[in-house]
Amino acid sequence: MRLSYRLVSGLLVLASIVGMSFALYLEHVKGLEPCPLCIFQRVGLMAMGFVALIAFLHNPVSNAIKRFYAFLAGVAILWSVGVAGRHVWLQHLPPDQVPSCGPGLNYLIDALPMKTVLQEVLSGSGECAAIDWTFLGQSLPVWSLAYFLLLLLVCLWQLFRFYPVFKTAKK
């Protein structure tokens, strides 16, 4: 069975919706407060979903445009992979090396320039090292990293897979 570009783009949109729905479920139903790194992971997931939605709706014929959309989606989810990897690393630091807790993300955004906010958030804080939820012995950032890596593989497959070239008939 050959998976069409549009079908895979639709599956990426669906995967983004599922991931965000689960994150919002954990936040609003289970009461888990997302740390700044969690929020940044969501941004990458939503950006990938947005690019995939545009690709799904546009359904380009040009292979170059298909690859461009796949590249943009891959870059977006690569952001989430990087942030989730940093999050996992912070959670595995020895307790004496965990950074102290910093101010909340809303305060940082209101008080500091965006470049400084990015530096502060990506350096992590003590709240990001706390493990509040586990499944099968793994923390939420580990599961998020695995999910994002799977989505990155799909984006890379979309980027590098063979697309048949359709030649138009001459009249």
Swiss-Prot record:
Protein known as: Disulfide bond formation protein B
Source lineage: Bacteria, Pseudomonadati, Pseudomonadota, Gammaproteobacteria, Moraxellales
Family: Belongs to the DsbB family.
Gene (UniProt): dsbB
SUPFAM superfamilies: DsbB-like
Listed GO MF terms: electron transfer activity; protein-disulfide reductase activity
InterPro entries per the UniProt record, alphabetical: DiS_bond_form_DsbB/BdbC, Disulphide_bond_form_DsbB, DsbB, DsbB-like_sf
Keywords: Cell inner membrane, Cell membrane, Chaperone, Disulfide bond, Electron transport, Membrane, Oxidoreductase, Redox-active center, Transmembrane, Transmembrane helix, Transport
Segments crossing the lipid bilayer: 9-25, 44-60, 68-85, 143-161
Cystines in this chain: 35-38, 101-128
The keyword Nucleotide-binding appears for this protein: no
BP GO annotations: protein folding
Cytoplasmic-side segments: 1-8, 61-67, 162-171
Cellular location(s): Cell inner membrane
